[in-house]
């Protein structure tokens, strides 16, 4: 039931235009034409006819597709397969056509191609009808959706009538058979709208030859009369939209060496961008500035080796001096030309006018005008005086107001300064209060922390010798050094006494030894002389006494003994030790004094 309803709707939507189709066939029959054709009007070529019956059908079953490549625009018939998809169109003009997928031409359901004469061995072009009549533009519009035929694989089923986009006329004699075999399919118009997709950017068109609307008269009035305006006729022999060459074996796939139109368009766009970039770089490249007024640029050779310029232009210098500027002569007075004739006559006094009658009105006017002018001047002076008075009053008011404003500004400034000063004082009070509270807290913390620390510190300092007895320190500093000095003096005096005693004892012993030796020598000399004393005997005691005196003098000299030699370095070391102890005691005393002062300050602060 649903299938029959869909068939009925499809039959109702399909237009019944069989008489129009017959009229179209009759118009498509080849006949001589005398009217000029518009460019693009004859954009269909009929393929060779296999039979007389196929001439009317194969003449308008063709669609021309415009493709633009590097060489220009070309048109090829588009072959539609059984699946209804558009194959890829070749870019060349003369290329063989690929046969259908099943190897047969014409209608697969009715056999119209082979039996009915729609497409034989010589008529291989089978295209889907188009629905866009008119002339082809210079470039195909990529945004126009392609117009495809119905879902039936036969391209002879429907064709668009001229001037209609939605009217399809069945052209196959067995179109009903296809309708039955296709099942519940929508009409060709709805199928055309469904199959149209923006992704397939192929522009298709078709147009019938028609006579141009000629406004000229058929015959000229005068043989020598020139036409008012030239008439441009279109020659289809040079029209790019007309296919050239063999159309019997067009291929649906491009040749291996044929470039892709999309790739060609992309290369052209890249070439345009590169050219535009190069032009921009040329414009941005630094060039020689233009010459100043009165000069011009001259080409100069910059090669390594100079060459003679044969075609040198002969230049000639010429001079021209103008006269000095002269003063402008005075402009003559303008004297207008006379327009009448001069006539002389004699006029006596009192003949032309009465003085009293003529002068009195003029005098009244002059006097009245003078009085009026004087009154105006007086009024103006009064007005100026009033303006000055009002201006003076305004200035006084303004000065008073300015003084008041200054007073108020000064008062505001004083208030602001007082406010800032009060804020500063309050901030200082708050700051001092915070500082005092922090000090009190720190003091309390220090007291609690030092409560147990001070005794231990004092004990350790006392144990280390930093706290000492003043009496003991006075004894160590004042008494002990004096005692040591006195002891040293006493010991030194005793050492000196001992040394003197030793020297005296030595001297006495030496004298006695000398006397003893002299006595023995005297006894030895007396014995050989038989006890006779001579002059030698009398002189020897003198010699002995001299030697004795020398020995005594030598014995009287203080000789350094071992004790004196040992006592000298001992005394130096002792003095150095005593001085170091004194310095240490002085430093300890200073430290103790500082600690006492700090403790007193803390007690006062508490």
From Swiss-Prot:
GO terms for cellular component: 9+2 motile cilium; cilium; radial spoke head. Residues 15-46, 573-606 have a biased composition (Basic and acidic residues). It is found in: Cytoplasm, Cytoskeleton, Cilium axoneme; Cytoplasm, Cytoskeleton, Flagellum axoneme. Residues 547-556 have a biased composition (Polar residues). The keyword GTP-binding does not apply. The keyword Cytoplasm applies. Residues 393-429, 572-604 form a coiled coil. Residues 1-103, 520-606 are annotated as: Disordered. Component of the axonemal radial spoke 1 (RS1) and 2 (RS2) complexes, at least composed of spoke head proteins RSPH1, RSPH3, RSPH9 and the cilia-specific component RSPH4A or sperm-specific component RSPH6A, spoke stalk proteins RSPH14, DNAJB13, DYDC1, ROPN1L and NME5, and the RS1 complex-specific anchor protein IQUB. Interacts with IQUB. Interacts with phosphorylated MAPK1. Interacts with MEK1. Interacts with PKA regulatory subunits PRKAR1A and PRKAR1B. Interacts with RSPH1. Interacts with RSPH4A. Interacts with RSPH6A. Interacts with RSPH9. Interacts with LRRC23. PANTHER family: FLAGELLAR RADIAL SPOKE PROTEIN 3, RADIAL SPOKE HEAD PROTEIN 3 HOMOLOG. Functions as part of axonemal radial spoke complexes that play an important part in the motility of sperm and cilia. Functions as a protein kinase A-anchoring protein that scaffolds the cAMP-dependent protein kinase holoenzyme. May serve as a point of convergence for MAPK and PKA signaling in cilia. This is Radial spoke head protein 3 homolog. It comes from Bos taurus.
């Amino acid at each position: 039931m649903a299938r029959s309803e869909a068939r009925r709707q499809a039959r109702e939507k399909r237009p019944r235009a069989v008489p129009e189709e017959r009229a179209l066939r009759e118009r498509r029959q080849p006949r001589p034409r005398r009217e000029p054709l518009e460019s693009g009007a004859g954009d269909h070529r009929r393929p060779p006819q296999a039979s007389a019956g196929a001439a009317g059908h194969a003449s308008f079953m063709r669609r021309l597709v415009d493709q633009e490549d590097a060489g220009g625009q070309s048109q090829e018939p588009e072959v539609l397969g059984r699946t209804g998809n558009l194959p890829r169109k070749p870019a060349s003009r003369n290329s063989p056509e690929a046969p259908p997928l099943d190897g047969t031409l014409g209608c697969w359901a009715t056999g119209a191609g082979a039996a009915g004469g729609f497409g034989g061995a010589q008529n291989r072009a089978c295209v889907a009808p188009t629905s866009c009549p008119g002339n082809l533009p210079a470039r195909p519009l990529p945004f126009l959706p392609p117009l495809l035929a119905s879902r039936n694989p036969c391209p002879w089923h429907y064709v668009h009538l001229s001037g209609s986009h939605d009217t399809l006329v069945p052209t196959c004699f067995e179109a009903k058979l296809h309708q039955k075999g296709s099942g519940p399919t929508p009409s060709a118009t709805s199928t055309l709208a469904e199959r149209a997709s923006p992704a397939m950017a192929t522009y298709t068109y078709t147009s019938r030859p028609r006579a141009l609307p000629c406004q000229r008269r058929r015959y000229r009035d005068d043989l020598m009369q020139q036409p008012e305006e030239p008439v441009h006729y279109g020659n289809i022999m040079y029209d790019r939209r007309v296919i050239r060459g063999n159309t019997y074996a067009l291929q649906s796939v491009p040749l291996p060496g044929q470039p892709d139109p999309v790739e060609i368009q992309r290369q052209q766009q890249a070439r345009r961008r590169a050219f535009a970039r190069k032009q921009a770089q040329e414009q941005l490249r630094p060039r020689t500035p233009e010459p100043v007024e009165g000069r011009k640029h001259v080409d100069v050779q910059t090669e390594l080796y100079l060459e003679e310029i044969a075609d040198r232009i002969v230049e000639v210098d010429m001079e021209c001096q103008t006269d000095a500027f002269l003063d402008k002569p005075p402009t003559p007075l303008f004297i207008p030309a006379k327009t009448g004739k001069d006539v002389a006559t004699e006029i006596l006094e009192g003949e032309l006018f009465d003085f009293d009658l003529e002068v009195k009105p003029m005098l009244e006017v002059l006097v009245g005008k003078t009085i009026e002018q004087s009154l105006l001047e007086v009024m103006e002076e009064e007005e100026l005086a009033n303006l000055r008075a009002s201006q003076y009053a305004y200035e006084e008011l303004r000065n008073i107001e300015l003084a008041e404003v200054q007073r108020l500004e000064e008062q505001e400034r004083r208030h602001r300064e007082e406010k800032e000063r009060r804020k500063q004082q309050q901030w200082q009070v708050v700051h001092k209060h915070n500082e005092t509270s922090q000090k009190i807290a720190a003091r309390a913390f220090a007291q609690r922390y030092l409560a147990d620390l001070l005794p231990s510190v004092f004990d350790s300092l006392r144990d280390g010798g930093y706290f000492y007895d003043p009496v003991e320190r006075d004894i160590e500093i004042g008494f002990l050094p004096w005692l040591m000095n006195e002891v040293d003096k006493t010991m030194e005096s005793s050492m000196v006494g001992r040394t003197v005693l030793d020297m005296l004892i030595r001297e006495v012993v030496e004298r006695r030894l000398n006397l003893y030796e002299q006595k023995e020598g005297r006894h030895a000399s007396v014995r050989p002389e038989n006890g006779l004393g001579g002059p030698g005997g009398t002189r020897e005691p003198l010699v002995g006494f001299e030697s004795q005196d020398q020995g005594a003098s030598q014995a009287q000299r203080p000789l350094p003994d071992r004790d004196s030699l040992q006592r000298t370095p001992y005394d130096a070391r002792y003095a150095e030790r005593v001085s170091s102890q004194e310095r240490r005691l002085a430093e300890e005393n200073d430290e103790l004094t500082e600690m006492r002062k700090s403790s007193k300050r803390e007690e006062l602060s508490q």
